Curated annotation (Swiss-Prot):
Protein name: SNF1-related protein kinase regulatory subunit gamma-1-like
Secretion signal span: none
Gene for this chain: CBSCBS2
Record note on quaternary structure: Subunit of a probable heterotrimeric complex consisting of an alpha catalytic (KIN10 or KIN11) subunit, and a beta (KINB) and a gamma (KING or SNF4) non-catalytic regulatory subunits.
Pfam families: CBS
Residue(s) carrying N-acetylalanine: A2
Key word Repeat present: yes
The keyword Transmembrane helix appears for this protein: no
CBS domain location: 54-120, 214-275, 292-350, 374-433
Native organism: Arabidopsis thaliana (Mouse-ear cress)
Length: 447
């Protein structure tokens, strides 16, 4: 127990250190006059978060922790949202957010769980000769998983006979043989396997709680309606939160949900104000943008597998990648975690995910973009573009990042994210969160 706590404490310290390093780089490079930065901080500190526009529909969609994955997918899809707060069923009536909410579930968490489940199931199917031959499907259950030494959500639930049988019917047994390798087995998983993931046991009964434990991207930290926009902007920039729930003291439900994108849209609406016009007219280079060098930007080649793109995003905790070609890394597209909706909603695409290249996936998305609200082309700017033009691109195109392209061949020079833009407008006063929100950075990142 002490060992796990030590590891957790080390991870928290590492996260804090990463946040500090990022923000120190931002502050040292953006070169805003101290008086202007203090004026901006004072202005944002005077704006209550309660004045921020409500989410569409005026109600934050929440999902119960015991909700099956299939139902969670439907809720997110029907509500046209990418994420939702998760209510701890054991403490649903609690007025303390620390007890009531477990975190935030999003499409990225679900798809990564689905992909891992598919991989593990394929290994189990290919490693058992009886199943590969299409007989004795029940032999591969929790026992088979344990024998193979698997870990993760699937190991916890076990591969029940019904799931294995349905998967076999979906295509694996059609290629009868002994000792098939796992990749081949996975390649043969057809539409029926997609249905297994969401409609058969044990996947059908897998809950949001289970996924949240395995694929948690960021801490859950709400602010009160009395908090300031400075608090929200610091959480969304320095501390890398993608969204900040808003609660009212003494009431259980989340009142609003402020995202990085919504804040940048709000900044876009500040045109005409002296402070905004001054900063937005500056070339991005004057603000130290992009904050990462070309070699630091994580990218994906167009001929690499889409599965590798999603894994790369997961491993680096980022929401998107530029698609590049050639030694000079010419920017030819963009893949983001938002695009995974298409993978979830199109079983014929999912069934071939192990063989699908980024380029092929982009082509399929391009033909369905209008229906699913997806955009595969990369939004770019030049090294001499103004911050205002970047903000306009982010807001008007509803994207999370703009790539900086250089030269005649649109070579990858850098990336500017929503987080980067917000960071340009704020700095953190000493001991700000301890003084204003009543908790330490360590507690925040431990949520």
């Amino acid at each position: 127990m002490a060992g796990s706590e030590a590891v957790e404490d080390k991870e928290i310290k590492s996260a804090v250190s990463s946040c500090e390093a990022y923000f120190e780089k931002v502050q040292s490079r953006k070169n805003l006059p101290k008086s202007l930065q203090e004026t901006l901080n004072s202005a944002f500190a005077g704006i209550p978060v309660s004045s921020f526009p409500q989410v569409p529909g005026g109600r934050v969609i929440e999902i119960q922790a015991e909700t099956p994955v299939s139902e969670a997918v439907k809720i997110l899809s029907d509500s046209k949202i990418l994420s939702a707060p998760v209510i701890n069923t054991d403490h649903e009536s609690s007025l303390d957010w620390r007890e009531r909410y477990l975190g935030i579930i999003d499409y990225s968490s679900i798809i990564l769980w689905v992909l891992e489940s598919a991989e593990l199931a394929a290994i189990a199917l290919s490693a058992t000769s009886a199943t590969a031959a299409g007989v004795g499907a029940g032999a591969v259950g929790a026992l088979g998983v344990a024998a193979l030494g698997m870990t993760g959500p699937v190991a916890a639930a076990g591969l029940a006979a019904a799931a294995v049988g349905a998967a076999v019917a979906g295509g694996v047994a059609a290629e009868r043989g002994i000792g098939k390798d796992a990749p081949t087995a996975a390649d043969k998983l057809g539409k029926d396997f997609y249905e297994v993931i969401l409609q058969e046991e044990p996947f059908k009964s897998t809950t949001v709680r289970t996924i949240l434990k395995s694929f948690r991207w960021a801490p859950f930290l709400p602010v009160s309606t009395e908090s300031s926009m400075l608090s929200v902007m610091l959480l969304l920039s320095k501390y890398r939160l993608r969204n900040v729930p808003v609660i009212k003291t003494g009431e259980p439900d989340i009142k609003n949900y402020v995202t990085q994108s919504a804040v940048v849209h709000g900044l876009e609406g500040c045109k005409g104000r002296d402070w905004f016009d001054h900063i937005s007219a500056l070339p991005i280079s004057d603000l130290g943008l992009p904050f990462m060098s070309p070699n630091e930007v994580i990218s994906i080649e167009s001929e690499e597998l889409i599965l590798e793109a999603f894994k790369r995003m997961r491993d680096n905790n980022i929401g998107g990648l530029p698609v590049v070609e050639g030694l000079n890394k010419k920017i030819v597209g963009n893949i983001s975690m938002r695009d995974i909706r298409y993978l979830l909603l199109q079983p014929e695409v999912f069934s071939n995910f192990r063989q699908l290249t980024v380029k092929s996936f982009a082509t399929k998305i391009a033909t369905a973009g209008e229906e699913y609200g997806l955009a595969i082309p990369a939004i770019t700017c030049r090294p001499d573009s103004t911050l205002g033009s970047v903000i306009n691109s982010l807001a008007s195109r509803s994207v999370h990042r703009v790539y900086v392209a250089a030269g005649d061949e649109n070579e990858l020079y850098g990336v500017i994210t929503l987080r980067d833009v917000i960071s340009c407008f704020v700095s953190e006063p000493p001991n700000y969160f301890e003084n204003c929100l009543g908790f330490s950075v360590k507690e925040m990142l431990n949520r």
